[in-house]
Amino acid sequence: MASAASVSSLADEVNCPICQGTLREPVTIDCGHNFCCVCLTRYLEIPCLDPGELPTCPLCKEPFRPGSFRPNWQLASVVENIERLKLGSQLGSEEEEDVCLEHREKVYYFCEDDEMQLCVVCREAWEHRHHTVRFLEDAAGPYREQIQKCLECLRKEGEEIQRIQLRENQRIQVLLTQVATKKQKVISEFAHLSQFLEEQQSVLLAQLERLDGDILKHRDEFDVLVAGEICRFNTLIEELEEKNQRPARDLLTDIRSTLIRCETRRCRKPEAVSPELGQRIRDFPQQALPLRREMKTFLEKLCFELDYEPAHISLDPQTSHPKLLLSEDNQQARFSYKWQNSPDNPQRFDRATCVLAHSGFTEGRHTWVVSVDLAHGGSCTVGVVSQDIRRKGELRMRPEEGVWAVRLAWGFVSALGSFPTRLALEEHPRQVRVSIDYEVGWVTFVNAVTQEPIYTFTASFTQKVFPFFGLWGRGSKFSLSS
């Protein structure tokens, strides 16, 4: 069988001088040169001749009569035999993929309007004549850039899902540790009680065991989900990297659907701890409420000492708005319309009538109680804020600004989320217990008298947070206790 090189050399001898492709239905003109019938016909249609002037040969420029060209059947037979040799030598190779399926010509161009790869014959077709047509490599450049951007986005998404996995696994570990700690303390406390309390012990332990199992189950489901997401992203990245290394024709094949897949593929950002599971964990202390009459002291210990460390906090005079009057021990604050002669230091609130605690938290579980005494029309805001909270000018109290708080107003209570939400409570609280779990990211508010849950924020703390208090209304005041 003839070698591929010799066949290719022979094929070059029977190329059309106009389209540079293999002769199709070859015709001969007066000078003896041969052309594709279609190419020569289109050449004669070009309106570039003066009236009465004969067209010239595209190769030697000799004039010829337009109607004098005749089919060259012998040359057509030679071309057909060369084509057979050419196809035989390319059998099993990838060269065949570079051939236009319609005209059997090699593709050189890419139509950006129709997103089609064109041979020289396709390029001259009327449907592409007024389109933007570029060489394959030139057309591939912008698409390579788009793929590169998609790869960068996918890699960032992959890194983000890995960060989520690490963060959520850390939260799971903290919750498992908390559950284990609660379990041991529940056992030790119930060991000193009567048979009546032993029944309660069994109930609580069973709930904790279910929570333990549910947390582990959620962890396994979360790990499977994250592993699947990572696998899908890695597969897509590998596919794009492999496609980006292909020749321009392969890269441009079905390029639009590939880009759409990249642009529409976004990672899910799952949470390892569902709101329902988190609510069950937070509500665990409330399961002991039936014991309130028999052992109020034990109930308080079960509700908070099993979960949180009492925080002995005091107000920071350096942050207090000039309209807030602090007690000498910095445990109480009262609103006054009279401005105090306070230095305007960077830490002080100058517009929002607020004050921070002297000390903040970077870890652990802490709780404190705020007793509120509101005058008519007054309000008190309690919660925690991030260390870099805005002190000067207007303060927007919402989680996006680093504020996790509830507002007790005359007749209603609101959770200050992205949009303030009025809460339906059985009793308007006069004492609010604020609890923070730094590692898990919970800020919980409970009626300190009735133990009725008020609200819980979920956050991801990255810096120091401080207990936060706001007060409004002449005569309104609050005091602190652990």
Swiss-Prot record:
Q: Does the keyword field hold Cell division?
A: no
Biological processes, Gene Ontology terms: innate immune response
* Residue ranges constituting the B30.2/SPRY domain according to the UniProt record: 293-482
Q: Provide the alphabetized UniProt keywords.
A: Cytoplasm, Metal-binding, Zinc, Zinc-finger
Task: Give the main localization category.
Answer: cytoplasm
Which cysteines form disulfides?
none
Q: Which residues bind Zn(2+)?
A: C100, H103, C122, H128
Query: How is the subunit organization of this protein annotated in UniProt?
Result: Interacts with IFNAR1; this interaction prevents association of IFNAR1 with TYK2.
**Protein's recorded name:** Tripartite motif-containing protein 10
Provide the species name: Sus scrofa (Pig)
Taxonomy of the source species: Eukaryota, Metazoa, Chordata, Craniata, Vertebrata
